[in-house]
Amino acid sequence: MEITAQMVKELRESTGAGMMDCKKALGEANGDMEKAVDILREKGLGQAAKKADRLASEGLVSVEVCSKCKKATISEINSETDFVARNPQFQALAKDATAHIQSSGIKTVEELNTSTLNGVKFEEYFKTQIATIGENLVVRRFETISADDKGVVNGYVHSNGRVGVLIGAACESAEVANKAAEFIRNLCMHAAAMKPSVISYKDLDKDFVDKEFIALRAELEKENEELKRLGKP
């Protein structure tokens, strides 16, 4: 049976699934609209599409570090609620996606969606997860850093899953790099706690430094005035 544009349009409007998914489902159903709806439902595609316009403002940060500490990936995957962010299935999804990003050398969300995970396109795999978990999920961003033989990388995610850090360092030799992994991880933990904006004070914006200096000087002058009033040196 010929699958017309009108049929695809009607199925898309009734299910919220993508146009190509609707066309494929109608083909499998030989034009039977009800059967096509069932096919989409079985694949979770209609449910995933209907959830796609719902705000995903919670979520998790996930970090994957290779065994030799030469490559590390950090990703942020959002959910609608904190409840789902604490769901073991969602946590496993975040971990699997981050590992896949690293092993595949993926650099953009577009590349991720068209890549293959467990024998299926990641986009389809992700839609299935949305349907199963029951909330809109979004891969917001990710980044991978790497090091050569004389370098080391490591990462850390705070226990609440909301803060993650990757750090890479160049070392004097491969021997030093092999011994530095734990130290770099501790640096990541420190950065997660203190939230520094730059690596060195030399990287600070001059206007920021000037404003901080003025504020500090005013604070010291006020403190000195108070000591003078109390007759203290």
Placement of each model-derived feature along the sequence:
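N-terminal assembly/interaction segments in proteins that build large macromolecular machines
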Residues: 2-233
